[in-house]
């Protein structure tokens, strides 16, 4: 794709006003762009950093057209929007990301089928439409396996681990509600991710390989650079993916590494990703900077420089009291509080980035500091 460069003062429309939209807006504004955001939550984080706010549901056609008419380019911060609605908008307005990636990736089945056709390394899977299909999954995959809903899952929602026959009932109940995909369970050594930006004329910029740890299915911390020898292999897998799926802007591919050190593609997020937040302080360009450069038609940096090894930690609602007590003593903690109105114990409320000469020591220090968040 080739498209015109936006000039200073042009307007970027963002569908979605969560923390990703907020950080996109902040990158856009420092480059001289104006921002309009559309979100159904009148207190969304992005509202208070945007030049204009449209309070509307994501399926409100009139509001989406208002956003498009008042924007020089439109982007989105998450994938759970209607691909049909997005397809209509791409015919009327400038949306470099397009609708194809959303159409493929918001459905776990089409995502896996596309990855399989692209010859990437993925775990064996079975389409689940009926309870009978679950029995076929047992035959093909064996125990244990994971049942995931085809649509709408994030942060571990819509997933069930089935270890034996006695745990099938919960899976049956899930399948009765909606179609699913069953995946073979992997004995995981490590989870990693690779954040990538594709720009005008297929320029491609890679961020360093990121090592991730989840707790209760929510990203807990990210260490960069990843303590793994799989970066080149991960890049090769991403190259296969980008030949199969149209991308413009920043996206992230998540991988599993098993105990035999084999790399598997897990899933793709077609927008900036939680594991890339460290890049705001730790890199010469953040994942949001490169996203804005891409969708506005600007040239991307040839390479991303990691300024220092880094540990990034998500901050949940239950972490904020401790953080408020400790923050003033630690000027080296780069704190981002997203501005969500309702504080819940397991809700992502912000993140914290620490640049360090010793990630292992820093990692252990933070685990001790955040009581109850260690393994």
Curated annotation (Swiss-Prot):
Kindly give the Pfam families that the UniProt entry links to this protein.
ATP-grasp, PurK_C, RS_preATP-grasp-like
What region holds the ATP-grasp domain? 112-296
Q: In which pathway does it act?
A: Purine metabolism; IMP biosynthesis via de novo pathway; 5-amino-1-(5-phospho-D-ribosyl)imidazole-4-carboxylate from 5-amino-1-(5-phospho-D-ribosyl)imidazole (N5-CAIR route): step 1/2
Cellular component (GO) terms are: cytosol
Which residues are ATP-binding?
A: 108, 148, 153-159, 183-186, 191, 214, 266-267
Catalytic activity entry:
5-amino-1-(5-phospho-beta-D-ribosyl)imidazole + hydrogencarbonate + ATP = 5-carboxyamino-1-(5-phospho-D-ribosyl)imidazole + ADP + phosphate + 2 H(+)
- Looking at the keywords, is Nucleotide-binding present? yes
Give the protein's biological function. Answer: Catalyzes the ATP-dependent conversion of 5-aminoimidazole ribonucleotide (AIR) and HCO(3)(-) to N5-carboxyaminoimidazole ribonucleotide (N5-CAIR).
- What is known about its subunit structure? Homodimer.
Query: What HAMAP family does its record include?
Result: PurK
Can you say what this protein is called?
A: N5-carboxyaminoimidazole ribonucleotide synthase
Q: What does UniProt list as this organism's lineage?
A: Bacteria, Bacillati, Bacillota, Bacilli, Bacillales
């Amino acid at each position: 794709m080739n498209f015109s460069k936006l000039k200073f003062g042009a307007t970027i429309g963002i569908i979605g006003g969560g923390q990703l939209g907020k950080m996109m807006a902040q990158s856009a504004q420092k480059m001289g762009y104006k921002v309009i955001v559309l979100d159904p939550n009148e207190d969304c984080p992005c509202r208070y950093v945007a030049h204009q706010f449209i309070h509307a549901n994501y399926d409100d056609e009139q509001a989406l057209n208002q956003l498009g008419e008042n924007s020089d380019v439109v982007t989105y911060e998450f994938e759970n929007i209607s691909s049909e609605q997005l397809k209509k908008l791409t015919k009327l307005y400038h949306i470099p990301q397009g609708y194809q990636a959303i159409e493929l990736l918001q459905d776990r089945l089409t995502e896996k089928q596309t990855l399989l056709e692209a010859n990437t390394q993925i775990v064996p899977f079975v389409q689940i439409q009926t309870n009978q299909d679950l029995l076929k999954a047992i035959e093909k995959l064996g125990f244990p396996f994971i049942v995931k809903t085809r649509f709408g899952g994030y942060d571990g929602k819509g997933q069930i681990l089935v270890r034996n026959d006695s745990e099938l009932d919960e899976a049956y109940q899930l399948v009765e509600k909606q179609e699913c995909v069953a995946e073979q369970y992997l004995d995981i050594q490590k989870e990693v991710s690779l954040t990538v930006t594709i720009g005008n004329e297929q320029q491609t910029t890679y961020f360093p390989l990121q090592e991730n740890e989840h707790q209760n299915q929510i990203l807990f911390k990210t260490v960069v650079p990843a303590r793994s020898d799989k970066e080149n292999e991960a890049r090769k897998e991403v190259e296969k993916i980008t030949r199969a799926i149209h991308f413009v802007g920043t996206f992230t591919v998540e991988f599993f590494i098993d105990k035999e050190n084999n790399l598997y593609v897990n899933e793709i997020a077609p927008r900036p990703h939680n594991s890339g937040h460290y890049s705001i302080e730790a890199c010469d360009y953040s994942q949001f900077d490169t996203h804005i450069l891409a969708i506005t038609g600007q040239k991307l940096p040839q390479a991303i420089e990691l300024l220092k090894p880094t540990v990034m930690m998500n901050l949940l609602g239950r972490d904020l009291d401790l953080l408020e007590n400790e923050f003033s003593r630690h000027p080296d903690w780069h704190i981002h509080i997203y501005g969500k109105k309702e504080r819940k114990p397991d809700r992502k409320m912000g993140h914290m980035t620490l640049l360090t000469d010793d990630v292992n020591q820093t990692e252990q220090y933070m685990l001790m500091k955040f009581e109850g968040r260690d393994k």
